[in-house]
């Protein structure tokens, strides 16, 4: 009997040893679940690598990790991401963006007309929902969830190409104030893209996870999410490992695109002052827009940025090469009033949450526009403390979603999950 027990014990020890050696020396399994940040202006996809315990945000073939949430329809096909964005100026009526503003929402005809005013593409009212009119070699309509499905399919294919495996499951983030219908339509979009959604997680919670706040002792977390087109400020209350979104406010018409537009308008004015004419070709306008966007990014890290763009101008001016030096101070002056608007929803969530600003334990920055030095300075001066900048703000949400995807996929080493407490009374207070 003792011999049999000894043999059994040796067998169990051998199994444990084999498992340990397997973990140490065999390649870890491929991730099975992807995490997707389906943003208003940009999308990102990430995975949690088993064994390594690391999140990887996947880039496209050019290494870009933030992909435009744009879909353009042409006679030759459907173009998503950067391909779609590149067609926006030449094909404005059939290039759809900001679909997230419409997905799952019910509108009166009057509300939809107001919401669709800024867009060149046509938005139709169908039984309370929005649809987009497309006219290529035929005329048809598409839904916001179809547009979202094309973006999600693009993320899915990027992940599959990078990992070398087929992907069928995902965790997706949504704004904390999305109601049940908006969440269901987002899941429907994922299903159209061939993805089973294991969990829908709130964007502020995902960001808090990326910063590791689900594992540390903090109570009140303020999340400032300033992306390309929207500002969302959320006040999270952490109770153990559980997050409750206590209050939310923002501005659905404020973001990096608005800052770009101010700078672009300044450049147009300078061109007109210098040459007495404006660019005439859509391609030139697109190139100038790209140059201004690049300059804005450069001014995040430096004090000056040079733009040099060949232009074809209307009238007798003809072809010229426009060159100018843009400064950070100029950029800040042009957008001073917009930057100050960020404080309004911050003050509102503190009021709704019945919290003094001194009671905020952690300030988390999300969205590429929070990289702008003046914006960080305004927030720091208001609170008298520096915001947490340990994570790339543009990738904070997708990092948190990928962590949750790893948890849902049973990846090891085991991670601490974030549990969300539903707040059925949560309503986002919008400012303009």
Predicted feature locations:
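Oxyanion-binding/catalytic loops of NTP- or PPi-dependent enzymes
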Residues: 2-114, 122-124, 138-141, 145, ...
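An exposure/low-complexity boundary signal
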Residues: 122-127, 133
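Generic recognition of long tandem-repeat/solenoid scaffolds
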Residues: 80, 130-135
């Amino acid at each position: 009997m003792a011999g049999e027990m000894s043999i059994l014990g040796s067998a169990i020890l051998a199994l444990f040893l084999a498992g340990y050696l397997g973990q140490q020396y065999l390649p870890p399994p491929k991730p099975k679940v992807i995490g997707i940040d389906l943003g208003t202006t940009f999308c990102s996809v990430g995975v949690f690598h088993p064994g390594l315990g690391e999140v990887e945000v996947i880039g496209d073939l050019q290494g870009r990790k933030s992909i435009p949430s744009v879909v353009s329809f042409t006679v030759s096909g459907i173009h998503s991401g950067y391909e779609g964005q590149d067609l926006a100026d030449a094909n404005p009526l059939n290039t759809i963006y900001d679909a997230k503003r419409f997905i799952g929402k019910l509108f009166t005809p009057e509300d939809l007309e107001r919401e669709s005013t800024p867009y060149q593409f046509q938005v139709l009212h169908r039984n309370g929902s929005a649809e987009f009119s497309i006219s290529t070699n035929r005329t048809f309509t598409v839904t916001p969830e179809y547009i979202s499905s094309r973006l999600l399919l693009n993320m899915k294919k990027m992940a599959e190409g990078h990992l070398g495996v087929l992907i069928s499951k995902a965790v997706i983030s949504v704004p904390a104030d999305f109601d049940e219908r908006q969440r269901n339509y987002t899941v429907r979009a994922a299903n159209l893209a061939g993805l089973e959604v294991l969990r829908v997680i709130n964007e502020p919670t995902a960001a808090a996870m990326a910063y590791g706040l689900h594992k540390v002792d903090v109570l009140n977390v303020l999340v400032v999410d300033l992306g390309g087109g929207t500002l969302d400020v959320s006040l999270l209350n952490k109770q153990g490992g559980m997050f409750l979104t206590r209050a939310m406010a923002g501005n659905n018409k404020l973001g990096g695109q608005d800052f770009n537009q101010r700078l672009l308008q300044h450049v147009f004015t300078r061109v007109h002052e210098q040459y007495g004419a404006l660019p005439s070709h859509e391609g030139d306008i697109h190139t100038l827009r790209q140059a201004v966007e690049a300059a804005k990014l450069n001014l995040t890290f430096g004090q000056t940025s040079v733009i040099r763009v060949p232009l074809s101008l209307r009238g007798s001016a003809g072809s010229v090469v426009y060159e100018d030096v843009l400064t950070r101070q100029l950029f800040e002056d042009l957008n001073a009033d917009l930057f100050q608007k960020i404080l309004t929803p911050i003050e509102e969530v503190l009021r709704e949450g019945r919290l003094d600003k001194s009671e905020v334990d952690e300030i988390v920055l999300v969205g590429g526009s929070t990289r702008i030095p003046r914006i960080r300075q305004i927030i720091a001066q208001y609170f008298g403390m520096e915001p947490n900048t340990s994570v790339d703000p543009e990738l904070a949400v997708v990092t948190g979603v990928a962590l949750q995807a790893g948890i849902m996929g049973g990846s090891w080493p085991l991670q601490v999950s974030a549990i969300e407490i539903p707040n059925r009374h949560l309503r986002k207070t919008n400012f303009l």
